[in-house]
């Protein structure tokens, strides 16, 4: 992973424009996301929050504008960026036919990790005793925690998370917030969407980007 101890700005957006079905979701949106930042993307349903996250992750192309990682266009440093990026969409990305342990093992190995204790990691998300349970038999909250477990064994600098608190109880949300703070304090950044209020991450620590769409 990239050593960024001397680099402050991790991800930058320059004049990003996104248009969907004759609606301008956002227009010439520019901002810098620095090491230590926790960023919440806000806006009504349909405002383009998920679209913006996907553009920042390099999974979708904007109508106009550019996204940069360490001041280089992500299209020119794709491999380096992907190594330092963890993206979790609003869908859990968990295979129902695999156990919780198998899902975590799969997700960590495809991310390049080979030295980890799946049982210990699952215990951190309150899934101790459910290691061998098929994901398809888990509750919605357990399903989501299975997806989120990889955050507890990850050294990517950039975390992009779409609705990470969905189906998570209050205690679980607080544990995630603490993890986000720890990740930011260690020089990473967290970019997320959520419809829930956060209790631990206060406004003086949280930066917000507001989206409001309009018709062309």
From Swiss-Prot:
Keywords: ATP-binding, Cell inner membrane, Cell membrane, Cytochrome c-type biogenesis, Membrane, Nucleotide-binding, Translocase, Transport. One of its GO terms (molecular function) is ATP binding. Its EC number is 7.6.2.5. SUPFAM superfamilies: P-loop containing nucleoside triphosphate hydrolases. One of its GO terms (biological process) is cytochrome complex assembly. GO terms for cellular component: plasma membrane. Transmembrane segments: none annotated. It is found in: Cell inner membrane. Its main location: membrane. It catalyses: heme b(in) + ATP + H2O = heme b(out) + ADP + phosphate + H(+). It holds the Pfam family ABC_tran. ATP binds at residues 43-50. It is a peripheral membrane protein. InterPro entries: AAA+_ATPase, ABC_transporter-like_ATP-bd, ABC_transptr_haem_export_CcmA, P-loop_NTPase. Residues 11-216 form the ABC transporter domain. NCBIfam families: ccmA (TIGR01189), PRK13538.1 (NF010061). The complex is composed of two ATP-binding proteins (CcmA) and two transmembrane proteins (CcmB). PANTHER family: ABC TRANSPORTER I FAMILY MEMBER 1 (PTHR43499:SF1). Part of the ABC transporter complex CcmAB involved in the biogenesis of c-type cytochromes; once thought to export heme, this seems not to be the case, but its exact role is uncertain. Responsible for energy coupling to the transport system. Belongs to the ABC transporter superfamily. CcmA exporter (TC 3.A.1.107) family. This is Cytochrome c biogenesis ATP-binding export protein CcmA. The gene is ccmA.
